[in-house]
Design a protein with these regions (language model features):
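Amphipathic alpha-helical segments used for helix-helix packing
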Residues: 44-67, 113-119
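C-terminal peripheral helix-coil segments that are non-catalytic and often amphipathic
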Residues: 27-45, 74-97, 101-150
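A short, mixed-charge helix-start or loop-turn motif at secondary-structure junctions
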Residues: 14-19, 62, 123-127
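Interdomain hinge/linker segments and adjacent boundary elements that couple functional modules
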Residues: 9, 22, 26, 41, ...
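Amphipathic alpha-helical linker/stalk segments
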Residues: 1-28
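Short, solvent-exposed amphipathic helices
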Residues: 68-72
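Short, solvent-exposed segments of well-ordered alpha helices
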Residues: 19-23, 67, 129
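Long, acidic, intrinsically disordered low-complexity segments
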Residues: 1, 5-10, 38, 51-56
């Protein structure tokens, strides 16, 4: 549990608080995306251990998968669902589709083996800059299609 408390900061659960308009909604979405892009690509301990467990559970769920889902995953998914509902209303299918699209793009970063990095990272671009660009790209796809409705 302590290991995953690093990967599920308490303030993630408070992202929806204070969202009242398009600008604050975009800030919350961006923070969600940037936070999880950072979590799944972390290179220092103890975060790297949490990222490795997350990678394993995403690709080959084990017996602890359900416990992780109940303890952490459901809360984090609820934050994203709440943020998406602010733009999509009560359309549960659209919320699931958008949630899946966002998560799949973040989760793809977990499984990129170092030997494949050259296929995804532009030559001469540092890790932090690349991660910022990836986060920007994910957010721009959301902001180009969805708008805060309350």
């Amino acid at each position: 549990r302590r290991l995953f408390s690093f990967a599920t900061a308490d303030d993630m659960m408070r992202l929806c608080e204070g969202v009242k308009d398009q600008q604050s909604w975009q800030v919350a979405i961006r923070r969600f995306v940037e936070t999880f892009v950072g979590y799944v690509t972390v290179t220092s301990k103890p975060g790297v251990y949490a990222a490795q467990i997350f990678r394993w559970e995403v690709t080959c769920p084990s017996t602890i998968s359900r416990e992780l889902q109940l303890a952490y995953g459901n809360k984090v998914y609820e934050v994203l669902r709440t943020l998406l509902t602010m733009a999509l209303g009560d359309d549960a299918d659209a919320v699931k589709i958008w949630g899946g699209a966002i998560w799949s793009r973040i989760a793809a970063l977990i499984v990129i083996d170092k030997s494949w990095v050259s296929h995804f990272v532009p030559r001469g671009v540092g890790r932090d800059e690349w991660l910022r660009r990836v986060s920007d790209n994910i957010c721009e796809s959301v902001f180009g299609s969805l708008h805060y409705r309350g």
